[in-house]
Amino acid sequence: MPDPSTYRPAPGSIPVEPGVYRFRDPHGRVIYVGKAKSLRSRLNSYFADLSGLAPRTRQMVMTAASVEWTVVSTEVEALQLEYNWIKEFDPRFNIRYRDDKSYPVLAVTLNEEYPRLKVYRGPRRKGVRYFGPYSHAWAIRETLDLLTRVFPARTCSNGVFKRHSQIDRPCLLGYIDKCAAPCVGRVSAEEHRRIVLDFCDFLAGKTDRLIREMEQQMNAAAEELDFERAARLRDNIGAMRRAMEKQTVVLGDGTDADVVAFADDELEAAVQVFHVRGGRVRGQRGWVIEKSGEPGESTPAYLVEQFLTQFYGDQAELGGAADEATNPVPRQVLVPVLPDTTEELETWLSQLRGSRVSLRVPQRGDKRALAETVKRNAEQALTQHKLKRAGDFTARSAALQSIQEALGLADAPLRIECVDISHVQGTDVVASLVVFEDGLPRKSDYRHFAIREAAGDGRSDDVASIAEVTRRRFHRHLRDAEAAPEGRPEQGPRASARPEQGPRASARPARFAYPPNLFVVDGGAPQVNAAAAVLDELGISDVAVIGLAKRLEEVWVPNLDGTAPDPVIFPRNSDGLYLLQRVRDEAHRFAISYHRSKRSKRMTASALDSVRGLGEHRRKALVTHFGSLARLKQASVDEITAVPGIGAATARAVLEALGADSGAAPTDIGNDQSRISG
């Protein structure tokens, strides 16, 4: 692997002007392209401290064998050149917004004598008008099926058209009046083109004129007593209205805009785009991309900049549109945040469009509501992507094998346990322990712990807390193993389900009678060393321990001799890293939910909770009857027994708990004059 010091530019040789740079590998292939306001500042950051770089960036620098740059005069030129180089070289370390499929569009071949309507995928061609993209081809076919009743335009291929012209007989669509049958001369070329142009006007949003004209024709036919034609026109108007209902007005001002939203985590980001034309959503597209890991390249502003550059650059290359409704670059692009290069991007997009383009962050009204809808779609897309990846058996097997190879384990970690600590400024310190078996969560084995020794009185020590949880968990394992009839029980998820053990033996304790293959703690070297020291103290040597640091997704292994080892770096697209991240995030979620529950109970605790035999229902009845604890404290035994279900003994216990007998009430109760509702 090349040494970065061998190709680092000489001090002072890098210009300070804006420009675009590219790294090449030993074979001359471009592996990364970037731009910078100051080439010197940006390039020096790659060589200053390799250990401080994100894993993906560090891998890129270690893979490269040379770096070169081009100075430009403006940031707009840098933006354009960066896009061109990424498009030309397809560098492996750059973020690429690739569709997982080619989205279909509705194409109208206006360059033919008899234009036709068709589902199309591929590069744009001159003389063809495009509508879309659509998320599915069936959505286009459904639209055609509905609208060809109103606009009976040709949808057949050139071969079918020629064959029916030769036999002088229309196809089935011609017989059922869903095609005007120009192949047999039922309409002229000019009449057929007029039908097609009306169809295009309808999809372009010019619906009011078409419906108004049809209503006039329907009324005229009715006055002439041509009821059959009037009924047909009525049905056509109904079909057009149904088609319009499928495209609900989302922006009342008839705006043409693209609405962009992101959802991301540490490794990946999902982007969704709604194409709004004439105030109606005409199409939707989505991507899931791998983030670079470099802090400056994982911000929302950077993701927006990269997406706009690549997406609209690609759209412009596919071919511009002849009118406003199908122009690939709209007048307005609504984004979640404005990038640092907003002015340069607006200038570049305006050049692509041929007129002014503005970038905006929606603040209120319909645009804000639509942006939130697109955001929810992005979140759903990211969730579905992760669930699909996690649920795939092949991916899970590859993930377990990847972890085994990276950590040098003897076997694949079929059972993984992970610990996470949660607290707020040292209060309500809790821990969670989650279990994954065969790469899937086993929620029946989840546990939570209230930290006893390592926390209290507003103090918290995460390292000591990790040690405490590890000790308690594996003490339980050793105790259950000793209690098993045959010494150490069978290791595996079904060890607790053997029929001969009986209902008591197969209950909760036996689930921890076998250890995990891999024990994960949330944190770096201090946390993982604390867990490893506990296992060493207990004499457990068959459990691998690692720590997963959140900042750079580094995997730490224990080193009890006091030296700081280098972390294990997984490739960012590794199934193994994805599984470890999912385990860690699940532990974090479970810990937070328990912490919030415990904190909520503490904040709503009442002196009545300590009264023996007084349940929640009767506590609510007392509070509802008297209105506050202060008034309840001032009541007599007879007044309290007037509440249904409260006897004299319970009433005296209530007054004793509130300090009424001694005349000294607890400080958090005696001054409580607030109203309390049940």
Curated annotation (Swiss-Prot):
GO cellular component: cytoplasm; excinuclease repair complex
A Pfam short name: UVR
A molecular-function term among this protein's GO annotations: DNA binding
Highest taxon in the source lineage: Bacteria
Keywords annotated in UniProt: Cytoplasm, DNA damage, DNA excision, DNA repair, Excision nuclease, SOS response
Major subcellular location class: cytoplasm
Ranges of residues in domain UVR: 208-243
GO biological process: nucleotide-excision repair; SOS response
Complex and partners: Interacts with UvrB in an incision complex.
Family listed: Belongs to the UvrC family.
Role of this protein: The UvrABC repair system catalyzes the recognition and processing of DNA lesions. UvrC both incises the 5' and 3' sides of the lesion. The N-terminal half is responsible for the 3' incision and the C-terminal half is responsible for the 5' incision.
The protein, known as: UvrABC system protein C
